[in-house]
Regions:
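A short beta-strand motif characteristic of beta-propeller blades
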Residues: 2-8, 49-57, 90-100, 137-143
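C-terminal hydrophobic structural anchor segments
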Residues: 90-121
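Blade-level signature of beta-propeller repeat domains, shared across WD40, Kelch, NHL, RCC1
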Residues: 129-155
Length: 155
């Protein structure tokens, strides 16, 4: 095995998804000490080039990138749940799901029923609460889970 090509995308990549056009989306948390802003980056895997690089405002810490079933809308955590249709060129300033006083720690998209799963770690000691929402952010229900639940796998 050998490296055939590379591309600098910034520091602290925290999520990766592939869209309906086979483009690679990477969420980079950035790096405060070196003044690198967090970014959402779209890479063309054929040309190995960055097609979109969208910076987040200072002080933001986006993470937990996932994509919907039709692979045309990304979701991520950033003190709330945000969506990003891949056809857009700018980030939304408002979350579809507000975090409030909760401690969102995990995010997933269930392609079987098109629902968003968000884990509230509460205080890192109690059992987490999993909240389930529609893609537009309408609350459906919540269920209890283990301590600091952070990932979701759907068959």
């Amino acid at each position: 095995n050998s490296i055939t090509d590379s591309l600098f995308i910034g520091k602290n990549a925290s999520g990766i998804s592939i869209d309906k056009n086979s483009k690679i989306w990477i969420l980079s948390k950035g790096d405060v000490p070196s003044s690198q802003a967090p970014k959402l980056i779209c890479i063309n895997p054929i040309t190995v080039s960055i097609e979109k690089s969208i910076s987040f405002a200072g002080g933001q810490t986006p993470w937990r990138l996932c994509i919907n079933k039709t692979k045309d809308t990304l979701f991520y955590l950033n003190n709330g749940v945000y969506n990003f249709p891949i056809s857009q060129s700018s980030l939304s300033s408002s979350p579809i799901i507000s975090q409030g006083s909760k401690l969102y720690y995990g995010l997933g998209y269930n392609p079987n029923d098109n629902t968003i799963y968000v884990s509230d770690a509460i205080d890192y000691v109690q059992k987490s609460k999993i909240e389930i929402y529609t893609p537009d952010g309408t609350f459906i229900k919540s269920v209890n889970a283990g301590i600091i639940s952070n990932s979701f796998i759907f068959d």
